[in-house]
């Protein structure tokens, strides 16, 4: 089975970070190519929140890419198969002026054609490019995927990251409860 990388529904809106776009953009992350940067990606949050509760999550949302905690990053970095497929980029998180280190951003290094276009519902993102990028209102994943993988970027919708049963099982075994598998 294939699952979309999705945060738990109880992730509060007040925990959405702002992605500081400097040398790496969200578009760069959608290319499935290794990125070389000396500087970490920066995420900021300036709201009155419970920092302890916020930092109890393992995956976080932003107006750019999602990013993961030091705990989840360490678990994944120790998985040799996973790090062959996904680059983990350094990220610094700034919460109300206080910097936190050790966070990572997923950069899947390959695309996977995985959307069943007959069962999914989409429309062209640009009306003058009917065969170009699509905006999906309903995504149905193909059931005939035989490729052995951990995480990939969806070829038909590059903003979508998909994960495999292997990664789902890894998360369950390591008590990662912030990711919804649907």
Q: Where does each model-flagged region fall?
A:
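Phosphate/anion-contacting hairpin/loop surfaces
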Residues: 1-182
């Amino acid at each position: 089975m294939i699952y979309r990388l999705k945060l738990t529904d109880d992730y509060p809106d007040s925990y959405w970070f702002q992605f500081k776009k400097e040398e790496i953009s969200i578009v760069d992350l959608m290319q499935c190519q290794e990125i070389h940067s000396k500087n970490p990606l920066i995420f900021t949050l300036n709201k009155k929140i419970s920092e302890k509760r916020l930092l109890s999550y393992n995956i976080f949302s932003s107006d750019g890419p999602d990013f993961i905690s030091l705990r989840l990053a360490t678990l994944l970095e120790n998985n040799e198969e996973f790090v062959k497929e996904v680059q983990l980029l350094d990220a610094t998180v700034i919460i109300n002026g206080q910097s936190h280190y050790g966070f990572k951003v997923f950069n899947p290094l390959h695309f996977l054609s995985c959307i069943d276009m007959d069962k999914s519902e989409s429309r062209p993102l640009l009306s003058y490019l009917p065969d170009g990028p699509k905006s999906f209102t309903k995504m149905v994943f193909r059931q005939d995927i035989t490729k052995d993988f951990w995480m990939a970027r969806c070829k038909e919708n590059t903003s979508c990251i998909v994960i495999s049963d292997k990664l789902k099982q890894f998360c369950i075994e390591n008590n990662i409860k912030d990711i919804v598998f649907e």
